[in-house]
């Protein structure tokens, strides 16, 4: 019994001891569970933003986000003070006139900075060169840059090392800093007058994009633009009420610019280079403005790599490569070997041809564009070039066929066929790429290069084997027009095949480096000083005035008359033989054959226009301004007039060389248009300028007398039998008016009085006065000279009218007389 009670008490005590802990155990474990698995922390605003459904991001460090219709930028604090460039290029286009790869933005450069609440984009302004520490300190205190954009800070990233802002307006198609279609071709006639207005509801952000130093967005945009036509003299016809639509996909990026790798290289008038402005500050001399050359950071340690589109066949690739690398010898002369390296597009997946910092040569399937185009990308605030895009359109081949056919086919049989041999075609590709690449390197065209050598030298195989055919490939010359049949076989160079002596000098000046502490300006002057021959001459092109006749388009050799004769010889040979050369039935209705007569006619006009630049021509260099001799000016006027008025079509050319319309014959077309197309009226102002500033001894009044004698010769003789000669008198009257504001005003008044009974003054580009580079003070007497010439024309027309008996011709003469009287203010 006692044992039983003891056992029961022992069991109860054990239960009492164990029960509290067993009952409390689950509560404690539940509390412990809550402690071990706490509620997840709330997301930060940045985390909510960056993980939002549907948001897309691209880039590392510098990032871009697409959030529906918004674009956000994430900018690390470490980039503050860095420079970026905002740019847009065409990626796809509905118009063949807006090519892929074309830049459609002004490439604005900005400096990144930040306040407590804003991300700021500042304009860097002009390059500043500071000559002493005193000015450096002063500018450091006063150097506040103008603000272009300010974006409120919206988020900080996870480790607070970057800020995020809503940058939608920066990438917006409405932002003129990002998009500008001004000047873009709408078709083969019209161009865009304005920057373009995005079409509502036709814009879409497709995706964010990123490259090693760039981020941005690809977007589909439709623009409305106002078309315009150039009208000469800086004027234009703008059709503001009419809107043309351009659709496309565009890539807009901000690119982080590297640290500037070049120094200021102030321009020199003896070397033509692309340039940007700079300001120099000195406590002794104050502020001075200048221009510094645009150039690449090319040195012994840094090369320029160029990638070529894989769409080009192998033969074209080799021609492109050789054309670009033809510039390497100029760099080797200053100690830089293989400065330019050309490669095919790499096959590895990381290569992106659309990267703004990739230099490339692209194929373009645009069949209507004919010229190679280049676009430079760089830091416009320092002048450093960072990349380029060269585009070769499909239409380039057709242009090559025409150029070769009418320039040299009679001398080189390879070009007498539509389907020329690939080797001949690639010679031209190489030459044209070599020419275009001079501009890529920062050189301006030097049209004086083609005038460095004499016709005798250009006919010499031994000379051309050593020197080529031009002193600068930046000139527009392509073929040696002095070549005759068989010359190529005996070793004469017939096409541009190497850079010239001026080109080598220009590269030496532009890319030479000097030890630290060198007075660079003096060193560069000494680089140029030894080179004084004609082959080193640089003459800038000054618009359509051509202020120095040694820098003209379409010329070759230092004898302008011989150049004209050779161009005409080639053209006549083509006309005589074209039918047999391209008589294949498959070409019967081809565009090549149909357009050939028009192309040939335009080449005749281009040849005479180049020669006529010597009328009123001057030589303008370090020794001052000198005029082309008066006798030679008069001789050129007579020569061109006689050529066109006596021109007759070769009998073998009659089946091919004819036109449809009012003037169907080739010689009729010439008589109707030669005075206008040769530039007789456009040279009036330069004749006046040369007489005033270069003492030519050939005043405008005398030139107008000579011109009137030539153009009214048949009417003065009573021979008004060819109706296609009447427009010459009409153009004479209009040409005089284009150089006389007084007569223009009188004519317009008469037009309004007659309620349109006579034609309004035509805004013809070829007749419009070209004012660029000609001081108005030089033309003070020109109005009176033109008025007196019009009086003489009126008198000639009145005399012809009294002698004419044909009623139809009387009506034409009366019409011409009405125009002259209206211009003279006669009622």
Give the residues covered by each predicted segment.
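Bacterial N-terminal signal peptides
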Residues: 9-17
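Conserved catalytic/binding loops enriched for acidic/polar residues
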Residues: 449-827
């Amino acid at each position: 019994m006692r044992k039983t009670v003891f056992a029961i008490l022992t069991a109860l005590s054990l239960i009492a001891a164990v029960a509290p802990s067993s009952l409390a155990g689950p509560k404690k474990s539940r509390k412990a569970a809550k402690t071990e698995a706490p509620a997840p922390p709330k997301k930060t605003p940045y985390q909510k933003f960056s993980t939002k459904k549907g948001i897309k991001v691209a880039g590392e460090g510098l990032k871009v986000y697409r959030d529906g219709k918004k674009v956000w930028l994430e900018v690390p604090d470490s980039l503050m003070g860095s420079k970026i460039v905002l740019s847009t290029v065409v990626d796809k286009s509905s118009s063949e006139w807006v090519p892929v790869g074309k830049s459609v933005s002004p490439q604005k450069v900005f400096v990144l900075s930040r306040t407590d609440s804003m991300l700021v984009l500042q304009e860097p302004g002009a390059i500043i060169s500071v000559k002493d520490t005193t000015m450096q300190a002063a500018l450091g205190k006063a150097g506040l840059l103008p603000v272009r954009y300010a974006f409120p800070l919206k988020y900080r990233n996870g480790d607070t090392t970057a800020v995020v802002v809503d940058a939608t307006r920066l990438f917006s198609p409405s932002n003129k800093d990002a998009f500008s279609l001004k000047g873009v071709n709408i078709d083969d006639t019209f161009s865009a007058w304005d920057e373009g207005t995005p079409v509502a509801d036709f814009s879409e952000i497709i995706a964010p994009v990123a490259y090693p130093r760039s981020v941005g967005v690809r977007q589909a945009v439709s623009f409305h633009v106002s078309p315009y036509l150039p009208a000469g003299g800086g004027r234009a016809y703008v059709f503001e009420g009419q809107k043309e639509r351009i659709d496309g996909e565009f890539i807009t990026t901000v690119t982080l610019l590297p640290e500037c790798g070049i120094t200021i290289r102030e321009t020199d008038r003896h070397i033509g280079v692309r340039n940007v402005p700079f300001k120099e500050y000195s406590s002794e001399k104050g502020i001075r403005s200048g221009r510094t050359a645009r150039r690449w950071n090319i040195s012994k340690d840094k090369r320029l790599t160029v990638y070529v589109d894989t769409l080009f066949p192998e033969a074209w690739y080799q021609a492109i490569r050789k054309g670009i690398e033809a510039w390497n010898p100029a760099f080797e002369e200053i100690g830089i070997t293989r400065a330019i390296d050309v490669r095919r597009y790499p096959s590895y997946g990381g290569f992106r041809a659309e990267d703004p910092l990739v230099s490339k040569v692209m194929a373009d399937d645009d069949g209507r564009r004919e010229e190679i185009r280049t676009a430079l990308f760089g830091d416009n605030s320092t002048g450093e070039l960072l990349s380029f895009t060269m585009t070769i359109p499909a239409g380039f081949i057709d242009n090559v066929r025409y150029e070769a056919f009418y320039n040299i086919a009679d001398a080189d049989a390879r070009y007498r066929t539509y389907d020329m041999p690939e080797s001949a075609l690639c010679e031209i590709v190489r030459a044209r790429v070599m020419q275009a690449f001079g501009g890529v390197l920062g050189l301006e065209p030097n049209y004086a290069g083609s005038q460095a050598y004499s016709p005798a030298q250009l006919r010499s195989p031994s000379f051309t084997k050593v020197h080529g055919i031009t002193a600068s490939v930046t000139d527009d010359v392509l073929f040696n027009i002095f070549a005759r049949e068989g010359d190529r076989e005996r070793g004469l160079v017939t096409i541009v095949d190497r850079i010239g002596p001026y080109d080598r000098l220009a590269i030496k000046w532009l890319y030479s480096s000097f030890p630290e502490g060198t007075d660079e300006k003096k060193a560069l002057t000494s680089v140029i000083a030894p080179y004084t021959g004609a082959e080193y001459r640089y003459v800038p092109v000054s618009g359509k005035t051509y202020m120095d006749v040694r820098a003209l388009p379409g010329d070759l050799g230092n004898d302008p008359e011989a150049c004209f004769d050779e161009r005409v010889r080639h053209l006549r040979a083509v006309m005589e033989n074209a039918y047999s050369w391209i008589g294949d039935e498959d070409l019967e209705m081809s565009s090549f054959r149909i357009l050939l007569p028009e192309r040939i006619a335009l080449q005749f006009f281009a040849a005479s226009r180049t020669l006529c630049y010597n009328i009123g021509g001057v030589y303008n260099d370090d020794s001052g301004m000198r005029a082309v001799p008066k006798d030679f000016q008069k001789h050129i006027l007579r020569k061109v007039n006689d050529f066109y008025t006596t021109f007759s079509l070769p009998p073998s050319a009659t089946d091919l060389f004819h036109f449809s319309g009012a003037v169907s014959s080739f010689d009729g077309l010439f008589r109707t248009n030669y005075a206008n197309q040769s530039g007789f009226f456009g040279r009036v102002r330069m004749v006046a300028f040369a007489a005033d500033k270069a003492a030519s001894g050939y005043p405008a009044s005398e030139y107008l007398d000579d011109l009137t004698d030539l153009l009214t010769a048949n009417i003065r003789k009573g021979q008004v039998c060819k109706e296609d000669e009447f427009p010459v008198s009409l153009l004479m009257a209009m040409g005089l008016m284009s150089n006389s504001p007084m007569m223009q005003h009188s004519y317009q008044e008469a037009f309004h009085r007659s309620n349109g009974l006579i034609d309004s003054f035509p805004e013809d580009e070829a007749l419009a006065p070209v004012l660029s580079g000609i001081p108005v003070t030089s033309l003070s007497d020109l109005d009176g000279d033109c008025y007196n010439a019009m009086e003489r024309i009126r008198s000639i027309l009145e005399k012809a009218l009294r002698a004419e008996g044909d009623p139809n011709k009387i009506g034409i003469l009366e019409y011409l007389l009405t125009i002259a009287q209206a211009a003279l203010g006669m009622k």
